[in-house]
From Swiss-Prot:
Belongs to the 3-beta-HSD family. Keywords: Oxidoreductase. GO terms for molecular function: oxidoreductase activity, acting on the CH-OH group of donors, NAD or NADP as acceptor. It holds the Pfam family 3Beta_HSD. It comes from the Viruses. It comes from Frog virus 3 (isolate Goorha) (FV-3). This is Uncharacterized protein 052L. The keyword Oxidoreductase applies. GO terms for biological process: steroid biosynthetic process. The keyword S-adenosyl-L-methionine does not apply. SUPFAM superfamilies: NAD(P)-binding Rossmann-fold domains.
Length: 355
């Protein structure tokens, strides 16, 4: 009898993790999807699934949710490089929220915590250049230009710090690892949905500024979910398997092709008949600066404006950043569950339903 709790379990990644556990982990007798925004549709997925409304900042509700759990997969957090949230909100949820999860796990005697981190703990950033086919030990001058990657870095360090901690003698010492996905795509991806609506509103034309020769690693959400399950199983198994994985961080990628952001989106939306226009950097740079200025000006009057294009996202889109997952393959046998052709088909099938 094994109980899993997935924080952020009704979100884009979290819901796919829940689905993956229900489908591929017959040893699991209960799954709790803990989320501030719950999905009533998910309640019909399985009798094993319990959907609980709760916030990682609510320690009492969180403690109740993880009580009796063997594994907690922590995906809850704010992913935001578009200034939809204040810096304080992002840091509070991503760092303090992670600490709350860790403390509740330790106090409840949870054996395993798998933390969803981000490649942005390492990069890319606006000053350090490209990172091509890099691994966890590849040198890179990490500079956190934005509060989001900074918060994920701090959260990852907290997870490392509390690895091996037990609430009392005789209670389980917490085993952990952190997974660092690249840009996640797939069914339910809000960024792809926003890209679709923005392109339709622009007359079915997408305007992009990522250089054609730049490359980024994008990873299918089903494979990210699969890696979380494999990592949790390795830690739960104990012995040499758990010893190798415990306290480690792993890049999370699959076999999706390395392309520029714009070229990859074009692959996914090829059946929608969109046109694509490359906008040179000398045009994009002042546009991004204008968006930054307008956002700050309107913010003085309490008006939120969060365009995808800003100086930070432009710099990221223009900086090649790709990773390898050989460490995860070596330490806990990760291989993508879905090949690129299947991941692309599934994503395109979902895109075809967008209106």
């Amino acid at each position: 009898m094994v109980k899993y709790v997935v924080t952020g379990g009704c979100g884009f990644l979290g819901s796919h993790i829940v689905k993956c556990i229900l489908k591929y982990a017959p040893e699991v007798t209960e799954v709790v999807a803990y989320d501030i925004n719950i999905s009533h549709i998910m309640t019909m997925w399985s009798s094993k699934l319990k959907v609980v409304r709760g916030d990682v900042m609510d320690v009492m509700a969180l403690a109740k949710a993880v009580d009796g759990a063997d594994v907690v997969i922590h995906t809850a957090g704010i992913v935001d490089v578009w200034y939809r949230h204040t810096d304080d909100e992002i840091y509070r949820v991503n760092v303090s929220g992670t600490k709350n999860v860790l403390m509740c796990c330790i106090n409840a005697g949870v054996q395993v915590l798998v933390n969803t981190s981000s490649m942005e703990v390492v990069g890319p950033n606006t000053t350090s250049g490209v990172f091509v086919r890099g691994g966890e030990r590849t040198p890179y001058n990490t500079v956190h230009d934005h509060v989001y990657p900074l918060s994920k870095d701090r959260a990852e360090k907290l997870v490392k710090h509390y690895t091996g901690v037990a609430a009392a003698p005789g209670m389980p010492a917490l085993k952990t690892c952190s997974l660092r996905p690249t840009g996640i795509y797939g069914e339910g991806c809000d960024l792809l949905e926003k890209f679709f609506h923005d392109t339709v509103n622009a007359g079915n034309v997408a305007y992009g500024g990522s250089p054609p020769d730049s490359e980024h690693g994008r990873v299918y959400v089903g494979n990210v979910a699969w890696m979380h399950l494999l990592a949790a199983r390795a830690l739960l198994a104990g012995g040499e398997s758990a010893h190798k994985v415990n306290g480690e961080a792993f890049f999370c990628y699959d076999d999706s092709p390395y392309m520029s952001y714009d070229a990859f989106n074009a692959e996914l939306f090829e059946d929608r008949g969109f046109g694509y226009v490359y906008v040179p950097y000398w045009v994009m740079k002042p546009m991004a600066a204008y968006n930054d200025l307008k956002r700050k000006f309107l913010g003085c009057f309490g008006v939120k404006r969060s365009p995808i294009l800003n100086s930070y996202t432009l710099a990221l889109a223009r900086t090649s950043f790709t990773v390898k997952t050989s460490k995860a393959r070596r330490m806990f046998g990760y291989m993508p569950l879905y090949e690129w052709s299947e991941a692309k088909r599934r994503t395109k099938d979902w895109i075809s339903t967008l209106k």
